[in-house]
């Protein structure tokens, strides 16, 4: 009687293992990736907060969209969709200042990490909040998101 249930359980376990069910090593790798993303977002925020002239400050008033609810790694799709506009604004703003970090390299790194973390899922569609936020608010909210994800993994 229980033989069928046992076989079903074994088949399900094998299917999960074969399809890449999360393991402790993948969790550790994900934690490292989230930590790297967090550091890069902090670097961008630091760069923005080092604005020395009024033109840069005005450029940073450009508005960005935030998802209505960001609680899972798949929501990084929403960050990925706003990275190009953010990079464009920062590149224009950076041309007005001298001693700045290389925005392109930093954004490429963030894009790479986001792509790795969110996975290859392409069917997820972001639901954005109606209100927009500034670049500083945008980065702060994504930093908070990463901190939240990281804390649930520890």
Swiss-Prot record:
Signal peptide boundaries? 1-20
Q: Could you give a single Gene Ontology term from the biological process aspect?
A: adaptive immune response
Can you tell me which residues are glycosylated?
23
Please state the protein's primary subcellular location. Answer: secreted
Task: State the compartments where it is located.
Answer: Secreted
- InterPro entries under this entry? 4_helix_cytokine-like_core, IL-2, IL-2_CS
In this UniProt entry, which cysteines form S-S bonds?
78-126
- GO CC annotations on file: extracellular space
Q: Which UniProt keywords apply?
A: Adaptive immunity, Cytokine, Disulfide bond, Glycoprotein, Growth factor, Immunity, Secreted, Signal
GO function term, MF aspect, one: cytokine activity
Q: Which PANTHER family does the record match to this protein?
A: INTERLEUKIN-2
Q: What does this protein do?
A: Cytokine produced by activated CD4-positive helper T-cells and to a lesser extend activated CD8-positive T-cells and natural killer (NK) cells that plays pivotal roles in the immune response and tolerance. Binds to a receptor complex composed of either the high-affinity trimeric IL-2R (IL2RA/CD25, IL2RB/CD122 and IL2RG/CD132) or the low-affinity dimeric IL-2R (IL2RB and IL2RG). Interaction with the receptor leads to oligomerization and conformation changes in the IL-2R subunits resulting in downstream signaling starting with phosphorylation of JAK1 and JAK3.
Q: Which family does it belong to?
A: Belongs to the IL-2 family.
Return the protein name: Interleukin-2
Q: What organism, scientifically named, is this protein from? A: Delphinapterus leucas
